[in-house]
A protein has these predicted regions:
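Beta-propeller domain segments
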Residues: 29-38, 148, 165-169, 175-189, ...
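Beta-strand-rich domains and repeat architectures in extracellular enzymes and scaffolds
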Residues: 45-70, 279-285, 301-302
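Surface loop/turn motifs at the tips and blade-to-blade linkers of beta-strand repeat domains
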Residues: 46-51, 90-95, 136-143, 194-198, ...
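Hydrophobic beta-strand segments that make up the repeating blades of beta-propeller
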Residues: 55-56, 63-66, 108-111, 159-161, ...
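Acidic, glycine-anchored loop motifs typical of Ca2+
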Residues: 82-88, 125-127
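Asp-box/WD-like beta-propeller blade repeats and closely related beta-sheet repeat scaffolds
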Residues: 115-154, 162-165, 196
């Protein structure tokens, strides 16, 4: 695998799609963007060179923020002249533990760093200062296995925080594992509440623009073979639903160890089974008007890509896919691919963020 380091792309309609690209031993200028396959009329370009970008967020003033899983840093990105390239890349915080998740509330930046939720107040006014973020909550598990987090504030004002399973497949005595928690950041004390259970490792979610339901990706377990189980796209219509893990994978695959322990537990099947081992991360419903009308309110999915499929079968994922609502139901197809060449990946999409002009940013860690 070629190691670049981190980038953010921008995708738009000619139409520009932007890509956040990592910093590494190879210059972003030499990225083989010509190998990426996009629909006719779309263009993709590098928006910023960033170290290991994961979740993206945007402030009220339009500053882009990028968390990281491995670099331990939070970056701020500023496109000062509006040319779709961030000339200024700032380190806003560093020496953090897997600060992958970011969320904006008002003018405050919230950061998920393993067991902690951190906060930088008045972020737009403090961009040129290296911050020591305030720890506002310290109580999530400190297990590093699936410990990185994607976070966001919901329509209800609560902070949604997934807590991944501390394993490939297990049934923990601690019910906070394999769940999505909510946190009222205005409360004292802050006490997490379980929103959804049976969620192995969700690293991306959003709310449907019409129903307000939470849609989230979930990464399927490993070591059941190259072609199963599927990864999942789920819809949570209310608090308290259970989405199957570790008992059921996808719609109907009983786990060989835990399937018989399901009992009378009622589980919610995925709204869409994704490919096996594609590792779906960030998602975004398209709400802009830059793309053609048939893209509106359709769901873009960043597929980070497989890591342990057999060489003879080949890797899967490493693309931006799109889930479309059609007269036949929800259908799933490729929007951008080409990061995987000859079974070797030169990029791994991680998150998607729509900008005010209707273009998309795609982080590649």
């Amino acid at each position: 695998m070629i190691e670049y380091g981190g980038v953010i792309y921008k995708c738009r309609r000619l139409i520009l799609l932007s890509v956040l690209i990592y910093i590494g031993s190879v210059s972003a200028d030499s990225l083989p963007l010509h190998q990426l396959n996009l629909p006719a009329g779309f263009r993709i370009a590098v928006f910023a060179k960033v170290e290991n970008p994961r979740q993206l967020a945007i402030s009220q003033s339009g500053v882009i923020f990028a968390g990281s899983r491995k670099a331990g840093k939070v970056h701020g990105l500023i496109d000062q002249d509006g040319d779709a390239y961030a000339e200024t890349v700032l380190v806003l915080a560093e020496d953090l533990t897997m600060p992958s998740g970011l969320a904006i509330r008002g003018n405050d930046l919230y950061i998920a760093a393993l067991s902690d939720i951190l906060k930088i107040s008045n972020i737009d006014q403090r961009l040129n200062q290296l911050k020591d973020p305030e720890i506002i909550y310290r109580g999530f598990p400190n297990k590093r296995h699936h410990g990185w987090k994607f976070i966001d504030f919901g329509p209800d004002g609560l902070l949604y925080v997934p807590v991944g399973a501390p394993c490939n497949i297990c049934l923990s005595d601690n019910p906070v594992f394999a769940s999505i928690q909510t946190l009222d950041v205005t409360a004292q004390p802050m006490i997490p509440q379980t929103f959804a259970s049976g969620v192995r490792n969700s690293v991306g979610f959003t709310w449907h623009p019409e129903t307000g339901h939470l849609w989230f990706t979930d990464n399927g377990r490993d070591l059941l073979g190259d072609e199963r189980p599927p990864c999942e796209l789920n819809e949570a219509s209310q608090r308290g639903q259970h989405f199957g893990y570790p008992f059921i994978h996808g719609s109907s695959i009983a786990d060989p160890k835990f399937g018989k322990k399901l009992g009378k537990l009622q589980t919610t099947a995925p709204i869409l089974e994704l490919g096996p081992h594609v590792a779906p991360l960030g998602i975004a419903f398209y709400e802009g008007d830059q793309f053609p009308a048939d893209y509106r309110q359709q769901l873009f999915i960043a597929e980070h890509g497989s890591w342990n499929r057999s060489i003879s079968v080949g890797h899967t994922g490493y693309r931006i896919s799109i889930a479309r609502q059609t007269s036949r139901g929800l259908e799933y197809d490729t929007f951008i691919d080409g990061w995987l060449q000859d079974n070797k990946a030169w990029g791994r999409p991680a998150d998607i963020l729509e900008l005010a002009d209707g273009s998309l940013l795609i982080s590649d860690d």
